[in-house]
C-alpha cells in the first residue's frame, strides 16, 4: 500500500476509536460518576 493510504487509515481509525471512547464515557458505565451541576444547584 501507499504511505498516504496507511496514514489515512490510521488517522481514521484513531478518530473512530476516540469517538467511541467519548460516547462510552458520556453515556456508558463511567457516566454514573459524573456530577450534574444543575442538580446540585437548587432553586
Curated annotation (Swiss-Prot):
InterPro entries: PSII_PsbN. Keywords: Chloroplast, Membrane, Plastid, Thylakoid, Transmembrane, Transmembrane helix. The keyword Ligase does not apply. Pfam families: PsbN. It comes from the Eukaryota. It is found in: Plastid, Chloroplast thylakoid membrane. The keyword Plastid applies. One of its GO terms (cellular component) is chloroplast thylakoid membrane. GO terms for biological process: photosynthesis. It is a single-pass membrane protein. The chain crosses the membrane at residues 5-27. HAMAP family: PSII_PsbN. May play a role in photosystem I and II biogenesis. Belongs to the PsbN family. This is Protein PsbN. The lineage of its organism: Eukaryota, Viridiplantae, Streptophyta, Embryophyta, Tracheophyta. The gene is psbN.
Amino acid at each position: 500500500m501507499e504511505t498516504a493510504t496507511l496514514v489515512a487509515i490510521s488517522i481514521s481509525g484513531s478518530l473512530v476509536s476516540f469517538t467511541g471512547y467519548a460516547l462510552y464515557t458520556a453515556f456508558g458505565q463511567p457516566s454514573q460518576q459524573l456530577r450534574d451541576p444543575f442538580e446540585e444547584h437548587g432553586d
